[in-house]
């Protein structure tokens, strides 16, 4: 496997050089000895994106204005995903959203639901709320949306995030489980945090649970998610809908006292085994896979071989200490081989969404507001990688 992967990387490098130079051939070097110019190669163009290839998607709000929606289409995305309206739904309500985007040439490939505390913590009303999720799955299938994404955690440790400086003074988002934050305004960016004033002297690792987000033990987590999955996955199978659980991000060992089983590869494997079905899948995030100290390609292999990747987040990181300290970077500036990730997706015939998320902050977005330019950069980068991989697979003979 290592030899095959090394060979692929050499071919990928040759292809990238050929495409960037507009060349039809490339010179090669073996054992530090120059060889003759290789014969001209025919590159199939345009590349074919179809039913069995990854689909670039961008995030929207279901009420977004048509100008933003059209800009997304102009920049090369044919698919979108979004936070879904609060449950419960009607078919008519969700169909109207689907039709609105369809009129702009965009298909909804995934929508995210927020699970209520009753499901996460086994509180009163759990079965009624699970019924609402089951109904939402049926409606999702009826309107033709293939994937529902969801989280299953008591608390997301945003308090460990802070902003660091990247290339050209870009704003990178960093995480440090042990970092103390005495002042929320310790830099010029709007630092994400949700600390109370009396918590500022503590590290994120020292924060305690709150009444609104009670601590959950690992045993309680597995009991609650097992109950949930056994209730909803059969409905998803019947409705031709795939469920995609997003792993813990950030993935520290504890988050305000709550266990974080979805912050480890072992936990992901255990999740997929609860109900052995392609409908019981995950959002594969090559960034999170690296944050927890795993090889993103190996994680991808494991999940793809079992047909459990139902959504994909395409981003890069630099990790100092797995699960504890890392920085999110531009996609071309981290430690993950993004070309290799995309090639493995293509070879696995992955056919759902690829979202190039978490763009670093840039000066244009800072001056104009929002983060649209950052997302367009990430989208263009990922689209270029996808087209390079598809060209390699479909027509380039290096």
What label would you give each PLM region?
Residues 2-53, 119-122, 138-146, 159, ...:
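Histidine-acidic metal/acid-base catalytic patches
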Residues 58-62, 84, 110-113, 150-152, ...:
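A cross-domain feature marking catalytic cores of carbohydrate-active enzymes
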Residues 61-72, 129-137, 295-301:
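Short, acidic/polar
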Residues 83-223, 238, 288, 346, ...:
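Structural motif corresponding to the early beta-alpha repeats
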């Amino acid at each position: 496997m290592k030899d095959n992967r090394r060979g692929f990387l050499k071919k990928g490098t040759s292809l990238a050089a050929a495409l960037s130079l507009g060349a039809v051939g490339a010179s090669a070097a073996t054992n530090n000895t120059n060889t003759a110019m290789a014969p001209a190669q025919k590159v199939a163009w345009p590349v074919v994106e179809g039913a069995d290839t990854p689909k670039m998607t961008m995030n929207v709000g279901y009420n977004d204005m048509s100008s933003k929606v059209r800009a997304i289409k102009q920049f090369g995305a044919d698919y979108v995903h979004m936070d879904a309206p609060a449950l419960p739904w009607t078919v008519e309500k969700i169909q109207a959203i689907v039709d609105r985007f369809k009129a702009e040439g965009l298909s909804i490939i995934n929508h995210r639901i927020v699970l209520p505390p009753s499901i996460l913590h086994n509180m009163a009303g759990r079965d009624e709320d699970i019924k609402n999720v089951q109904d939402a799955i049926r409606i999702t299938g009826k309107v033709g949306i293939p994937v529902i994404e969801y989280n299953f955690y008591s608390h997301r440790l945003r308090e460990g995030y802070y902003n660091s400086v990247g290339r050209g003074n870009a704003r990178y988002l960093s995480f440090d489980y042990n970092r103390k934050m005495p002042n929320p305004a310790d830099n010029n960016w709007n630092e994400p945090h949700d600390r109370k004033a009396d918590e500022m002297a503590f590290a994120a690792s020292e924060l305690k649970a709150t009444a609104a987000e009670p601590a959950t033990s690992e045993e309680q987590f597995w009991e609650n998610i097992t109950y949930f999955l056994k209730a909803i996955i059969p409905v998803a199978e019947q409705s031709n809908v795939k469920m995609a659980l997003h792993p813990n991000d950030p993935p520290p060992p504890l988050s305000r006292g709550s266990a974080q089983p979805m912050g480890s590869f072992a936990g992901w494997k255990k999740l997929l085994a609860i109900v052995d079905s392609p409908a019981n899948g995950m959002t594969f995030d090559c960034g999170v896979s690296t944050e927890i100290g795993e090889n993103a390609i190996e994680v991808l292999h494991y999940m793809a071989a079992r047909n459990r990747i139902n959504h994909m987040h395409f981003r890069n990181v630099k990790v100092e200490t797995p699960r504890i300290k890392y920085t999110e970077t531009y996609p071309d500036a981290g430690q993950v081989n993004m070309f290799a990730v995309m090639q493995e997706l293509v070879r696995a015939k992955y056919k759902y969404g690829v979202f190039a998320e978490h763009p670093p902050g840039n000066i244009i977005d800072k001056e104009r507001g929002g983060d649209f330019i950052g997302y367009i950069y990430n989208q263009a980068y990922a689209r270029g990688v996808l087209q390079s991989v598809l060209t390699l697979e479909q027509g380039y003979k290096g």
